[in-house]
Amino acid sequence: TVTTSAMRSEVRAAAAGAPYLCGYMDAIELTDTYPYQEINDYLRANPESREDVANTLSYFDCISFADKIKCPIIINIGLQDNVCPPETGYSLFSSIGSKQKKLFEYDGHGHEAGRYIHTSIVDDFFAEHLKGDS
């Protein structure tokens, strides 16, 4: 969602829950769960590759594209998410270029990031921003 919103100007509104692939190098320090641990597994076997890994992953990191997002966007994160650490969600949110952005934080929620509570917010958001689309 994030990268597509950044790269496609025709995207008129976006919503991303528990954003993944953000702040790779921070995420590997913040969580010990997979899939991010695959990076640590590789770096333990190839410690000399850390700089190359960081450089390569920057090409795929959503944060690298976030400043190009111009459409309205909402992000929801779970503050106890051990898959996509909330810190990386905060970094993503602060990097988003759109002036119309809102972050929803769900305390007591993990990777589901308040999904069941948040569904109606997403529905209302799209209804507002995609009026007249069929």
Named regions from a protein language model:
Residues S49-F65:
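Active-site nucleophile elbow and catalytic-triad environment of alpha/beta-hydrolase enzymes
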Residues L103-G114, T119-F125:
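Histidine-bearing beta->alpha loop at or near hydrolase active sites
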Residues C71, P85-S94, L103:
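Short alpha-helix in the alpha/beta-hydrolase fold that links the catalytic acid
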Residues F126-S134:
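Short, hydrophobic alpha-helical segments
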Residues L79-C84, E112:
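Acidic catalytic loop of the alpha/beta-hydrolase fold
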Residues I69, I74-I77, D81:
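Short beta-strand/loop motif that positions the catalytic acidic residue
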Residues T3-E48, E105:
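Hydrolase active-site cap/lid region
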